[in-house]
Amino acid sequence: VIRGNHHDAWEFGAADPIRGMVALMEEARVISELVKQGYKPKRTLMFCAWDGEEPALLGSTEWVEDHQEELKKKAVAYINSDGNARGFIYAAGSHGYETFFNEIAAEVKDPQTGVSIRDRSYAKVLADADRAGKSRIYGNKYMKLSALGAGSDYSPFIQYLGISALNIGFGGEGSGGEYHSI
């Protein structure tokens, strides 16, 4: 399982990529602590920091090309997160991950509200929907994954090698004016 994020930015990168990179580094630190306590992941985990994402996905693409034979044999998933901010969970990816994503999102508590991150996002979707939309989605908290485009480091994994991918993050509660700056 490959977990990645880029570390290059157009400007100072306060939101993209630093927020995503901080999350990746904390995940790696916590997994490391768990391993020291005896936890053994069922799969090999790789934490990757890519360069050259902003101009053309250069780092991840070159790495995928250089390691394609091993990746074809061993890689089962790529998980990406460019940005995290205050707000609501969002995800795009290989649709085989929908149930997995929904199960996890239903279990993770939002620290601000105490409800699950899935329920918090559902409440926002419901509040923002028009009348027809409300009647269509009311009571259905299942979150559909959006389709992945070609705009981040998941691209070479899914588009070049066919490795399933997931792009996750949080956002939607701020102006986002600092996206590519500080």
Q: Which residue stretches match the model-derived regions?
A:
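Structural motif
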Residues: V1-I2, A77
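Alpha-helical metal-binding/catalytic segments enriched in His/Glu/Asp
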Residues: R3-L57
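Metal-dependent peptidase/peptidase-like ectodomains
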Residues: W50-I182
